Amino acid sequence: MTPTPLRVLLSAVGVAAAAHLARADAPSQDRAAPAAARVDDLMRRLTQEEKLSLLGGDRDFYIRPVPRLGIPEIKMADGPLGVRNYGPSTAYPATIGLAASWDPDLAREFGAAVGSDARARGVHIMLGPAVNINRVPRNGRNFEYLSEDPYLAGAVAAQIVAGIQIQGVVATVKHFAANNQETDRGTIDARVSERALREIYLPAFRAAVEQGHAWAVMCAYNRLNGSYCSANDWLNNRVLKGDWAFKGVLMSDWGAAHDTPGVANGGLDLEMPSGRFMNPGALGPLIASGQISQATIDDKVRRILTLEVANGFLDRPQLLSSTPKDDPRSAAVALKVAREAIVLLKNDHGALPITGKKLRRIVVLGPNAAGLPAGGGSAHVEPFHYVSVVDGLKRVVGRKVKIDAIPGPGPELLRSLLAKTTFEGPLKLEFMTFDWENRKEIAAVTDTRIDHDWDAGAPAPVVDAADYTARWTGAIRAPATGRFIFMVQNHGFVTVKLDGRTLISSWANPNDALFAEAPLEAGRPYAVEVMAHHDNQGPAGIHFAWGAAPPTLTDDQAARVRAADAVVVCVGFNAMLEGEGADRAYELPNDQPELILRAAELNPRTIVVVNSGGVVATADWIGKVPALLQAWYPGQEGGRAVADVLVGAVNPSGKLPISYEKRREDSPSYGHYPGSGGTVDYAEGILVGYRGFDTKGVAPLYPFGYGLSYTTFSYDKLHVEPTQDGRWAVTFDVTNNGAQGGDEVSEVYVSPPVTSKAGRPVRELRGFSREHLATDQTMTVTVVLDRHAFSYYDEAKRDWVVEPGSYTVEVGASSRNILLAGAVDLN
């Protein structure tokens, strides 16, 4: 029957009335209601089963929905360097490079771009930033972190968080706390004094929570002073939720929970990736017996619901389909960060920028010249496209200058080695389920080579084509003593082991070839294991080969290097060699030092570009080259940024967020890493990084806060004056004395009174300012210090204390280049 207008009107009135009644009965659905009232309503309506189910993650990266109450499924994504897990995305520079910009405004811009990319994929929660202190130079995740200094790390972290969350996406600050090495990270007990925690390892987290207003914190895998971080009552309940009044959600790292009562009472709100210990079956009996209180459970549920309601997740779609996934605005931010991140460490005799009317040919060589160098693990992002250093130079120099690329080992070498690769007898090939924790063998056969293209099909009739692990085991025998290269091409995660030692462990791009070198003895058998994982992310197949390592440079390549007007050697690490799960080597890998030395021998105009998350050994070659750039992992636009700096289109302005020691033994943590017997003792206490170098009088190769420019700056006219609100204004002039505009980072340090009995560092960073100055421009800069800038943590008083006496306020261009000094008397 066709409805009459009256029926339509009555129907509309009925719907409106029903909607009004629904809002009255369910304040949780009333967008105009306060968040607390909406959460109260949801708490009343949730069943106990639903409450307990919310405390464990679902399908790896989700929080469970409650559809009947309008509570949506909440989607998460790694990580700190861009949106991972859901296909290609903008690959930003490593955040240690962002910290090297000393630019909090840029950090906020970076966070906002990441948040926008997240909305383009319907992501509610980003699992970043990562803000642990760079204590150990070899830490595999240093590239994800920010600095050895807590003030700089906190200033950058707070703005990343604010930027992400301004887009309607939750930021997750990780890894809480003292997760400063990957070696034994799942079990190691970090023994750290409360003073060192309060002064060094916790301030960046505190800044992210109190200044950035982070909605989520992720606990670390390790133990801290005896207790796993996921169940550490002092860390989670007293400090985070007590002292800092954190109202958000504390989640576990993936698989970091170890028992139900420990994590429930120890402050954990959400177990990820699933509720192995935080589920109705495990929690229910403990609540009934009184081991876990209902109030404890309700607090966790309330925190999760408050996060969801306050961030609008119940009221709007999270997906912004109008935002492109490959967003040129995000790419522009990635380029800006990459440019500001680059630190010019050495520039003798004006080797840089590469300019001149007679410039005709630049040779670019090294393993990172033509690819995308990036750190590995959960922070690794696969971009839609990228610009290599070779590509970047070709773009900026035009047709008048030839860019002569000499690539490192790649697919072409792999193909030539495949025909020569042999094994000692047949290989055992096992197929297993893809489940990382509980692999089950499906089938076992023999194979004669590892050279297969399975595409979308199954490698064996009984194997699921979408999800499987294949493992080959066998032996090889070297025909001669010398260095040999091992190469593999795969789509997915792949590991290669030689006599039990891991040579390759990385996600692989099917268009590239991973490689590692190792010395072998003639006639000796070596056990080989190759394991490849396929998880339906692309065509399946694997190609593995080994053979004699190629020469550092062929005769033809050497001639090209000798004849070049400039040589750029791109060295460092990559996703296979530096990343989550293991700490990296201190020395440059494979034959990279020999490559630098050979290039420098052939051509004195050799410039080195290093990609790494931190310090690398330089003693063997630093005296042989005139120029050195620390480019970190510069992201998808990194090749263009490096090229811009090399040719002078961009004036380098980055400054080290870490200290660059001359040798590994000089690091304050040396001798207190990686620990033994399941424990690592942070015996250096608060003397981390430059605090240790300066206090103990050890000269670094390049100090904290150091970075050269193509122009020069001078400092003058320091004034330190009290303000009406009890703070101190540090005012000084900075002048650009050179012929090129540039950015300068001015650093403000505080030194304790000479009468101090508190065992304080010689100086500590307490403020900074980044400014752009045109040629001959003078700018007056003011940095304001609050009372906390003069305090230390007194363990006996369990409080921050300001000692009476005369403090020195220092202004400089690095921790070892103090240019101005004044005094503040606190009596």
Which sequence ranges carry the predicted segments?
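Bacterial N-terminal signal peptides that target proteins for export
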Residues: M1-L10
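Bacterial N-terminal signal peptides
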Residues: L9-A18
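Flexible, membrane-facing loop/turn or short amphipathic-helix motifs
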Residues: E795-A796
